[in-house]
Amino acid sequence: MPSLDLDVFDPAFIPKPGQLFLRDFKTRVTPNDTQRNTLIVAGVYIVVIFILWHLPYLRVITPLSLVLSNLICARLLTVGFHEMSHAFVGVLTCAKIYSIELDPDEGGATSMSGGIPWLTLPAGYLGSSFIGAALIACGFNTNASKVASIVMAVFFLFTLWWARKNWLSWLLILGMSGLIVLFWFVGGGIALRYFVLFIGVMSCMYVIWDVVDDTLARKVNTSDASEFARICGCCPSRVWGFIWLVVACIFFALGIIVGLVSFKQNLEQQKIDSSHFLPVPGASSGALSLSPNHYRAAWTITISLSVLGLL
């Protein structure tokens, strides 16, 4: 067998560690068919959310008003994530939380005293961005979505404790909790996966749009960025708003990347895994589990949330 003379090899053809990493990363983030469908649905969510936020007169058109009511309910939920993030960091910094209020027109407000303001103020946007990114990543896998829904239920309990005097918070959280239970039964949990994905996209979009609207496009003196700028004194509110916007976009992208890298299972494999992890009672008989179709599940979510929005 002839020997190989390693000296004749051109070092330029030997891949460098950085090139190997980029090649491996590109392979891991390349979506399979199931992930590609998930990305398409997420893209549709983004387009619908963006259009309805900029065309409020669509309320007068009956079919689109259903979707708009859906959007309002989901937006209130993401506002709840924002306020809950304020409260959570407030508790960690020894603040006293008095109440959390949600309002469909004004957004939300967290009443507290004490704590560290330069931590509690940015926690709203950064916390809801992180939650949105985590939900987007979980939206690529059925079992991960089940875990995410349980974590959301814990968030709901804390929010209800601090917002126990706000009836809108009770209606919203009880309604969303009912939808989580309902979607758990649809398609072996596939509808729950798209519901979690929708809430994740909505949470990230809320942060991006709210920062742009309150800080960059127009200056609101009562915004988190304005209060943070007043406390720090080193930069104007628009600078902090821009920084938070960049961080929110990074979280959004990381949520998608983590989902693509971590959850490569196809639809059939996810269905099998889901049947062994917190399975739906009676799902094996097919009595309670509907056909696991991507777009049917997405439409089920849209219709159900629209009904909730009309209540």
PLM region spans:
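Hydrophobic transmembrane alpha-helical segments that form the core helix bundle
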Residues: A123-T222
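C-terminal GPI-anchoring signal of eukaryotic secretory precursors
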Residues: C232, P279-A298
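Terminal transmembrane helical module of multi-pass membrane proteins
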Residues: F185-S274
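Cleavable C-terminal sorting propeptides in eukaryotic secreted/cell-surface proteins
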Residues: S291-L311
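Individual transmembrane alpha-helix segments
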Residues: T30, E106-S129, A133-A134
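Topogenic membrane-insertion module of multi-pass membrane proteins
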Residues: M1-L66
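Divalent metal-coordination and catalytic microenvironments
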Residues: H82-M84, G124, F228
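Small-residue-rich helix-interface/hinge motifs
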Residues: P56-W118
